[in-house]
Amino acid sequence: MKVKVLSLLVPALLVAGAANAAEVYNKDGNKLDLYGKVDGLHYFSDDKSVDGDQTYMRLGFKGETQVTDQLTGYGQWEYQIQGNSAENENNSWTRVAFAGLKFQDVGSFDYGRNYGVVYDVTSWTDVLPEFGGDTYGSDNFMQQRGNGFATYRSTDFFGLVDGLNFAVQYQGKNGSPEGEGMTNNGREALRQNGDGVGGSITYDYEGFGIGAAVSSSKRTDDQNFGLNRYDERYIGNGDRAETYTGGLKYDANNIYLAAQYTQTYNATRVGNLGWANKAQNFEAVAQYQFDFGLRPSLAYLQSKGKNLGVINGRNYDDEDILKYVDVGATYYFNKNMSTYVDYKINLLDDNQFTRDAGINTDNIVALGLVYQF
């Protein structure tokens, strides 16, 4: 019985992101669930900047309130706390925080810190035990988590077509901490964005899925101005940052296969030097869920920058920004406890480009023991 339960449970965990959220309150149309995990995590690598303890905790809640028969209010908050630093260091941050309204079959609208619509498709390959999902990053225009997202979603196409979902999204400007481009939540140029719009559409049928997403954001003056505001500009200058992505997945019969291809313009970060004028990003993953709780994983990820331009006085054309094979496995003891190993086999060469951009070229082995609820 335990084996059969695990075989049914694990795919649900991967989708939900939480093993079994603890129901704190459910009465009179109001519901509040608490979820979280503690990951006792250690990296082994020749790169001393990541080698060692990486332990962290995540905690969040999801709430709903029934306003009328047709209208439901909801909200979600998730926080991460690093467990590998001294107590006087402030290494914690909000991952998501948003509130919204759902109008039955009409759709839902929410606002806050959330995931960009591009992640509706690229998330299909972001399922590795520890690594993965790094041909993009957080606060990277509309490619992953970010601030100021206003999102409309329709599930099952207004209730008319099962499995057909679409979303339309707007992101407000998150600019500089000072000067003309200042906003109340100003940040470094690599994590800024101007006003942006995006959309996604996905279709799932009997385990098969196909999806596409696009986004276009204005770039800020800081992003087009320079590394030190006086001399060299960041690479990847342009009025807009654009992303076009497509993906496929299969999730049935204990098999999970997914792949996504994304082409970006002035949107993919090149280490700490700016953005690629054009980048081609590819991720593919294959996993199998054994009935006794073991889930091996194999993946390949590559991000190739095109026509990068001049960096530190050197002219670079086409360079790999990221390229690795990932081999890993997770073992689920039950719905709340798991352990994993994840080996990132870095295929990048240590050369002048990677040194200029501050890109890691070393392999990493991650070992983790996870309690989640």
Swiss-Prot record:
Membrane-crossing residues? 34-42, 54-63, 74-84, 92-101, 107-115, 142-154, 164-171, 197-203, 208-215, 244-250, 255-262, 272-288, 294-301, 325-332, 337-344, 365-372
Any one biological process term the GO annotation gives = monoatomic ion transmembrane transport
Extract the SUPFAM superfamilies matched here.
Porins
Residues spanning the signal sequence: 1-21
Q: How does it sit in the membrane?
A: Multi-pass membrane protein
Q: Which UniProt keywords apply?
A: Cell outer membrane, Host-virus interaction, Ion transport, Membrane, Porin, Signal, Transmembrane, Transmembrane beta strand, Transport, Virulence
GO terms of molecular function: porin activity
Name the segments for region: Loop L3: 116-133
UniProt entry tagged with the keyword Signal: yes
Q: What happens when the gene is disrupted?
A: No effect on propagation of phage Sf6. Upon infection with phage Sf6, single deletion mutant has a wild-type level of small plaques with no change in bacterial survival; double ompA-ompC deletions have about 10-fold fewer plaques, survive infection considerably better than wild-type, are infected more slowly and have fewer extracellular vesicles associated with mature bacteriophage.
Question: What subcellular locations does the record give?
Answer: Cell outer membrane; Extracellular vesicle
A GO CC annotation given for this chain: pore complex
Known function? Forms pores that allow passive diffusion of small molecules across the outer membrane. (Microbial infection) Serves as a less-preferential secondary receptor during phage Sf6 infection; infection requires both lipopolysaccharide (LPS) and (in the absence of OmpA) OmpC can serve as the secondary receptor.
Sequence similarity: Belongs to the Gram-negative porin family.
Q: How does it assemble?
A: Homotrimer. Forms mixed heterotrimers with OmpF and with PhoE; other mixed heterotrimers are also probable. (Microbial infection) Upon infection with phage Sf6 associates with the mature bacteriophage capsid. Was originally suggested to be within the bacteriophage capsid. This has been disproven.
Can you name this protein?
Answer: Outer membrane protein C
Organism of provenance? Shigella flexneri
